[in-house]
Structures are given as C-alpha cells and as structure tokens.
Amino acid sequence: MTNIRKSHPLVKIINESFIDLPAPSNISAWWNFGSLLGVCLIIQILTGLFLAMHYTSDTTTAFSSVTHICRDVNYGWIIRYMHANGASMFFICLFMHVGRGVYYGSYTFTETWNIGILLMFTVMATAFMGYVLPWGQMSFWGATVITNLLSAIPYIGTNLVEWIWGGFSVDKATLTRFFAFHFILPFIISALAAVHLLFLHETGSNNPSGVMSNSDKIPFHPYYTIKDILGLLLLILVLMLLVLFSPDLLGDPDNYIPANPLNTPPHIKPEWYFLFAYAILRSIPNKLGGVLALVLSILVLAIIPLLHTSKQRSMMFRPMSQCLFWLLVADLLTLTWIGGQPVEHPFITIGQLASILYFSIFLILMPASGIIENRLLKW
C-alpha cells in the first residue's frame, strides 16, 4: 500500500511543498525568512480576526472600541499589541527576505521575484489601512496626507481622491471601506504567497553560492523544518519581548489622541517601516515627482533582474558588490531616520543625497560593479 502522504491528493501537495521537497544542502539562516513571513501572516490573520470581533468601524466609536478592547476584553491588550507589533516583525522579516534576494541574486527567478514585489505592495497597502483604523490623530492625518498624494495624478487626480474618500474629506465612509479592505487583503496576500511558492518550486531554491545545486539536494523535512522552528522561536521571543515589555516602542504617541480634523499634529509621519519611502517622497519638491519616486522606491526592485551584469549570480564572491550592498543598507537606515525628522535645513539635504544614492546604487553603481568584477576575473 502506498504511503497516504504520497497518494492522497491534498496531503500530496503538502508533502511536495514541506516534507519531501528537495532543498539545497547549503542554504543559510537567511533562507528562514520565507517561513517566518508565513508565520507572521498567520499571527496577523488570527489576532486581526479577534480584534475585528470587537472593533467598530465608525468615526464616533472606532477610537473607544480600541480602548474597550485594551481595557475590557479578556486578553484584548495582548491581542491588540501582538497585532500592532506583529506588523513590525512582518516588515523586519520582509526587508531581510528582500535583502537576501538582492544579495544572493535570487531575483533571477523573475516570476517568483515579481510576485514578491506585488506581495510587498499589497502588504504595505494592508499595513497603511490598518494604521488608519484606531482613528487616532496620526491615523487620520496619515490617511489624509497619503491618500491626498493621488491628487498629483494629472486630470483624474482630484476625482480619484474623492472617490477613495467617499466624500470631500477623510470621514466615516473612508474608515468603513479601509476596514473592509484591511480585512480582505490578508487573504489575498495568502493566495499570492501560495502563487509565490508555486513559482519558487518550479525552479527550486537558490543557495548562497549562487550555483546550481541539483547534484546536492536534501529533503526539506527534517533538516529545514527544524531549522525553521529555531527561527520561529526567535521570532516569537522578539515579538513577545516587544509586546510584554515595550508595546508602544515602535508606535506614535499622537495616536493615543482621538482624531481631530481641526488640529494638525506637529509632525505627520507614518509607521517606522514606511519612513524610508516617506523620506524619498519628501526629498523631491514637486508633488507628482515625489509620488513617482515613492512608487519607484519599491518598483526599482523589478528592474534589478534586467540590470544584472555580473557573470556570477550571488554576491558571495564579489567584494565590490558586497560593499555597495552594505552601503545600500546604511542608506536605507539613513532614509528611515530622515523620514522621522522635521522638514528643516540639514535633514532636507541629507534626505535628498540619500535618495539620489538609493537610486544610483540600484541603477548605476551595481551594474557598473558587475562589469568591473567581470573584467577583474579575466585580469
């Protein structure tokens, strides 16, 4: 009798994806982030579901319903903070995952990579809409500022913004639709993640050396299931340290003030994981130019496969490209810092220089270093 694991139509899919999957024998801890993102998504869907049971998407009661969750619902505070900090963990894993892809040349799997970019946009949209739901000051003004950016689109801009708002300003209709979208998008993300995996399993995983690993494969279970569980334990440890010791560390104190359309906060800024893109947006004095730069800050990832000039796939043996990669990481940290600063003299210039450097690394310096390294190989 055949093993049910290999014969049952449904169990067979799980078996081929997580148990008998042939995996390269040398993939490092940087390959853990895919499974960690899956865990983050599950945590977010579960905690979000329980929050949605008590939340009301009405401008008059939204803020108090979140307060009610924290004060009166059994373990409501831990569910709420796991959801808020879970989003931060999600983005940390996402940035690490994308960074790994750039460093080791995983972007040469173009279908997987492009679905990944689509996933990133969807996750960012979901997080933005989730930030609006508590209806604090930063929720309201963040929603106003970010949705207003669409008015920069020529001809249809103003109509588009009012259509998204459901009126002439961010109000009850906006909050209700944002809640609806925030609820449905994680399930769309789950479907996209399944497609992401489907495309990945067509080619098999990349590995740190960037060479074909067909001659040396090991089964996913038990080797990488155990390895992923270690990563999972560390993720949960960090998440629970955040939730139980400093739940508001990554949040904005302004969001504990109920939304007031008549009072603008001194510094309107998004959550920390959007600050790098926000800094790029602000560094361009033109509204439409800023919006384009904002979109391109993520969309530039789609151009990387076309600009891969090196004969080697991975950066493992390419010191020049490695230096550029870590310069990019430092640049992103600088942009994140600038995004949280007021629009004043030194910060404006630093932001503009960091933005120029960001695009230069992707579009000019990395392809150039690939060509130079090819020449050095012949030398």
UniProtKB/Swiss-Prot annotation:
Domain of life: Eukaryota
Topology versus the membrane: Multi-pass membrane protein
Ranges that cross the membrane: 33-53, 77-98, 113-133, 178-198, 226-246, 288-308, 320-340, 347-367
Compartment(s): Mitochondrion inner membrane
A Gene Ontology molecular function term of the record: ubiquinol-cytochrome-c reductase activity
Residues in the signal sequence: none
Binding site residues for a ubiquinone: H201
Keyword field contains Transport: yes
Presence of the UniProt keyword Iron in the record: yes
Binding-site residues, heme b b566: H97, H196
One Gene Ontology cellular component annotation held by this UniProt entry: mitochondrial inner membrane
Keywords: Electron transport, Heme, Iron, Membrane, Metal-binding, Mitochondrion, Mitochondrion inner membrane, Respiratory chain, Transmembrane, Transmembrane helix, Transport, Ubiquinone
Main function: Component of the ubiquinol-cytochrome c reductase complex (complex III or cytochrome b-c1 complex) that is part of the mitochondrial respiratory chain. The b-c1 complex mediates electron transfer from ubiquinol to cytochrome c. Contributes to the generation of a proton gradient across the mitochondrial membrane that is then used for ATP synthesis.
Assembly and interaction partners: The cytochrome bc1 complex contains 11 subunits: 3 respiratory subunits (MT-CYB, CYC1 and UQCRFS1), 2 core proteins (UQCRC1 and UQCRC2) and 6 low-molecular weight proteins (UQCRH/QCR6, UQCRB/QCR7, UQCRQ/QCR8, UQCR10/QCR9, UQCR11/QCR10 and a cleavage product of UQCRFS1). This cytochrome bc1 complex then forms a dimer.
Family: Belongs to the cytochrome b family.
Other noteworthy facts: Heme 1 (or BL or b562) is low-potential and absorbs at about 562 nm, and heme 2 (or BH or b566) is high-potential and absorbs at about 566 nm.
Name assigned to this protein: Cytochrome b
